[in-house]
Amino acid sequence: MARNLKSMMLCGFGLLCFLMIVDRAYAREFTVGGATGWTVPSGSQVYSQWAEQSRFQIGDSLLFVYQSNQDSVLQVTRDAYDSCNTDSPTAKFADGKTSVTLNHSGPYYFISGNKDNCKKNEKLVVIVMADRSGNKNTASSPPSPAPAPSGESAPSPPVSGTFEMTPAPTPTTSEDTPNSAASSLSFVAALLGAALASTLFLH
């Protein structure tokens, strides 16, 4: 009886680990700004429109690509975002290829470490949804719009039951691809789970 209980516990633990890894495999990596990357944008709404095109969820990550000798990325509070205050960031990155994992729901605020660049709208806010059910944007749950840069008013949300999205310029390549490392991990986990199950059943 004790042996059966131990086998059941091992199977349960293996299944739990497998499910956690499979959920992680659905995480996506978004290259900020698409092919253009993290730089002073050509217009005041470029990063807002980029953020509105995607639905960010817990476990996803943002990839900032930039010239490390000319720019950096600061994660900041909303007040610092609004005022382009670079003095006290919550996190600072300057490696030229920064990946930031979105590990909780709610807003994330990013600005350029170069204050002049931030004032030229090199700043980004993304809203992370808590749900990872696989449902994409629907009329019943439209994505939250990113706030407009300071000095500009944000468009009002639609009043009716349907919503309209203003077409935004699309990047030349789609950069929101599944995390390949996580996909590999899920495959390895499946193999380990099968090996564990066969070992338990053979004994």
UniProtKB/Swiss-Prot annotation:
Protein name: Early nodulin-like protein 9
Record SUPFAM superfamilies: Cupredoxins
Residues cleaved off as propeptide: 181-203
Keyword entries, A-Z: Cell membrane, Disulfide bond, Glycoprotein, GPI-anchor, Lipoprotein, Membrane, Signal
Spans traversing the lipid bilayer: none
Principal subcellular localisation of the protein: membrane
Annotated S-S bridges: 84-118
Secretion signal span: 1-27
Record-level GO cellular component terms: plasma membrane; side of membrane
One Pfam family linked to the record: Cu_bind_like
Glycosylated residues, chain numbering: 103
CDD domains linked to this entry: OsENODL1_like
Function: May act as a carbohydrate transporter. Mainly required for reproductive functions.
Similarity field: Belongs to the early nodulin-like (ENODL) family.
Organ and tissue specificity: Specifically observed at the plasma membrane of sieve elements in vascular tissues of leaves, stems, roots, flowers and reproductive organs. Absent from companion cells.
UniProt cross-references to InterPro entries, sorted A to Z: Cupredoxin, ENL_dom, Phytocyanin-like, Phytocyanin_dom
GO molecular function terms attached to this record: electron transfer activity
Covalently attached lipid (GPI-anchor amidated serine), positions: 180
